[in-house]
A protein has these predicted regions:
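C-terminal amphipathic alpha-helical "assembly" element
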Residues: 144-145
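Conserved N-terminal glycine/acidic-rich loop preference
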Residues: 162
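Short, glycine-/small-residue-rich phosphate/pyrophosphate-handling segment
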Residues: 169
């Protein structure tokens, strides 16, 4: 606890009585997180992520690469035990609504991600679930991806498991 306090107070050197890799790791993570730039969003790598070992007929969910959004969606789906493909589109680390308002998360960027990550080759049931807050993109996305069925999911990640059980099975 004293080491963490010293790190928070900008200590240059911390001397510890015992060396424990687990403790040192936590202190290093604390040190790194204290000095991150709050104006630079923390991002995840744009990619297609497999959650709960999805099969080709499982649904494809779409979100942005803002870390909090990604982890919210991924954790809810993983916790439900339902398999899904999660396409994370590059939105410069912005949340869904922020990226949509800034023109960084639109039908073109979603279609680009779907094509770039070869999603069509991984799935047999071509159904994409958009975040509920960007339902207005569904018509444009149908034009960008004519072979796909576009569905509008819930507005909040916490509602995804119930939506997936009722609307996608």
């Amino acid at each position: 606890m004293l080491a963490a306090h010293s790190i928070c107070k900008d200590a240059c050197v911390v001397v510890m009585e015992k060396f424990s890799p687990e403790l040192v790791y936590q202190i290093l993570v604390l040190r790194k997180n204290i000095f991150t730039d709050p104006q630079k969003p923390i991002q995840v790598l744009p990619a297609i992520y497999e959650i709960n070992d999805p099969k080709p007929d499982d649904p494809v969910l779409v979100t942005t690469n803002f870390s909090i959004t990604y982890f919210s969606v991924a954790n809810e789906v993983e916790g439900s035990g339902l398999p899904a493909w999660l396409v994370v589109a590059d939105a410069e680390g912005m949340s869904v609504l922020t990226a949509w308002a800034a023109g960084k998360f639109d039908s073109e960027s979603i279609a680009k991600a779907v094509k770039q990550f070869g999603v069509g080759d991984k799935v047999s049931k071509k159904v994409i679930v958009l975040p509920g807050h960007v339902a207005v993109l569904s018509g444009e996305l149908e034009e960008e991806l004519p072979d796909w069925e576009i569905r509008v999911g819930p507005r909040e990640a916490v509602d995804l498991p119930a939506y997936m059980k009722s609307a996608l099975t």
